[in-house]
């Protein structure tokens, strides 16, 4: 199958870019973009490679994505080696095919076609690419956004190529994401012998009523755009492993995925009030990995919906479900942010794959979005 989108996707898959190692993917993309007149600025931080590229001036539409992938797992369980792209029955297999090297290829090919047809386009077309989205994400998009904001770069619209679709390309478009807040809580007691509980203070026993009340809280009911806030205990640990020792500490880690009905400060205040109510001795550490954001109907959402309807003859659902993405950082620039990408059924799995025809379709959708916003 000879198709520029498929060929570029295959070239990217062959580069084993385990986060945050770019493995040469960005050099390939940069070469293609420079060939059509893009100015490219490398913005590397620590072990992470990033670049910001632009062509033209004025109202700005950026395409954002990541070259890094998650580990493939047991390579013997793949139907073909994970970094040797293979097409079987119309499906392109390989680590990163769906998340998100296929999207990157579709973006670049769409830009090539767009520039060929609109060499003097009126707006600015840009790319923001990182090699660290799947791992810590500390030196990727967030650092680039900080640098761009420090020099007052303009960013009006951003299309993130994350695999948003469920069954067919464009059936789901993400126009926002929930916030994510993690609490690392240690409850302090006094270690001792289980036969002498009066000489100890069991933090597990003390924390049990608190945890029972915590998990029963209805944080909010969500709203038109977001499901209700969810709190889940992710890790809990206490004890020495011995059956005759009362533990001295209990560690509990829990995560909130929260809607725009709440702020992180509101959540923190409620948790701390509950800790005080139960008279617990504790230390607490919070990690806010992203605020919730929402892009309401406007020029970007309308352009994306139009492109999907034009090429796939379906009306996409606008959802905010799922995990976080780098869109949470880009939204800080005041940009309208929308995610549109391939079907996500196999992302992070053994035998990750994407329908090859879907990538061709995605490139056409991306090009139409460019034409509506910056032609």
From Swiss-Prot:
Cofactor(s) needed for function: Zn(2+); Co(2+)
Q: What class of enzyme is it?
A: hydrolase
Q: What EC number is given for this enzyme?
A: 3.5.1.18
Q: Which reaction does it catalyse?
A: N-succinyl-(2S,6S)-2,6-diaminopimelate + H2O = (2S,6S)-2,6-diaminopimelate + succinate
Please state the pathway this protein functions in, per its UniProt record: Amino-acid biosynthesis; L-lysine biosynthesis via DAP pathway; LL-2,6-diaminopimelate from (S)-tetrahydrodipicolinate (succinylase route): step 3/3
Q: Does the keyword Metal-binding apply?
A: yes
Q: How does it assemble?
A: Homodimer.
| Protein name (Swiss-Prot/TrEMBL) | Succinyl-diaminopimelate desuccinylase
